[in-house]
Amino acid sequence: MTQKNASSASPLSYKDAGVDIDAGDALIERIKPLAKKTMREGVLAGIGGFGALFEVPKRYKEPVLVSGTDGVGTKLKLAFEWNMHDTVGIDLVAMSVNDVLVQGAEPLFFLDYFACGKLDVDTAAAVVGGVAKGCELSGCALIGGETAEMPGMYPPGEYDLAGFCVGAVEKSKILTGVAIKPGDVVMGLASSGVHSNGFSLVRKCIERAGANAPATLDGKPFKQALMEPTRLYVKNVLAALAAHPIKALAHITGGGLLENIPRVLPEGTAAHLTKGSWPQTELFAWLQKTAGIDDFEMNRTFNNGIGMVVVIDASQAAACAATLRAAGEAVYVIGVIAARGDDAAVLVR
């Protein structure tokens, strides 16, 4: 037997191998006008170069850069199944900019990473359109990103997302929580829904409910209620920070209230939350009933209706709440800071 001469075989292009450079170029052209809408003070060079350039605004005297990175988790599985791709980009931005905000920082710029097995330009453009929308709503520039088409790495129709944010805060205004003391008030800002954590359990609940899943939750179609994008707290909370002496913020993500509030509490303090001090939505009531889990597990898995926590001196709480409500936030006084004994750092009772 003779081996076929490789030189006589048909030539192979990169496209034959599964990577379509033309599709990637087409996507970039669709992204550019979306990114342009997010441009802000400080952007020197954005999408198209080898690296994006950003100058820290001159109004900062002692700027400290704050970075954050995150993804959207298994919420993407529902996006694939339900063909709902236009809001997961907002989720991606929110997960990082809300984290950066917790340090007292203003998000400055954002980069996204979109990975897939085969690039569908329409799907990718819908996703990145959501990223641009999230950046625009946060006052954050979409300054660059990466689209990776990797044949064989992802099943057809699926992709993964990651996001990266950099913000800035005056060194003297970094929120550390060190000034928190017993008697301080704990306020909660309402979430828009499940946000981007707990979706492995959400998907199990959908599977368990099957045809018995409700048509609507909280006045929204079932799928829309579950896919509602993570709330962006940036602009409203930055305004409150400028007007009131907020001591700490906590972004309620994976681990819920029970795992995230302790991250900003100084040693020797605890947060005592009052059960029923904020409304339980139909969405979370359905998840709890369908999963058959207790309140403790709900508060450790989901945000359970509270997406951001604010800790402030009792004398300042009413004024701060009024500022946030005037900006459109639903605000609840959900607890108080106490001296910590032998109990957990967060108690809900």
Swiss-Prot record:
This is Phosphoribosylformylglycinamidine cyclo-ligase. Belongs to the AIR synthase family. Transmembrane segments: none annotated. Pathway: Purine metabolism; IMP biosynthesis via de novo pathway; 5-amino-1-(5-phospho-D-ribosyl)imidazole from N(2)-formyl-N(1)-(5-phospho-D-ribosyl)glycinamide: step 2/2. It comes from the Bacteria. Keywords: ATP-binding, Cytoplasm, Ligase, Nucleotide-binding, Purine biosynthesis. The lineage of its organism: Bacteria, Pseudomonadati, Pseudomonadota, Betaproteobacteria, Burkholderiales. It is an enzyme of class 6 (ligase). InterPro entries: PurM-like_C_dom, PurM-like_C_sf, PurM-like_N, PurM-like_N_sf, PurM_cligase. Its main location: cytoplasm. GO terms for biological process: 'de novo' IMP biosynthetic process; adenine biosynthetic process. GO terms for cellular component: cytosol. It is found in: Cytoplasm. One of its GO terms (molecular function) is phosphoribosylamine-glycine ligase activity. It catalyses: 2-formamido-N(1)-(5-O-phospho-beta-D-ribosyl)acetamidine + ATP = 5-amino-1-(5-phospho-beta-D-ribosyl)imidazole + ADP + phosphate + H(+). Its EC number is 6.3.3.1.
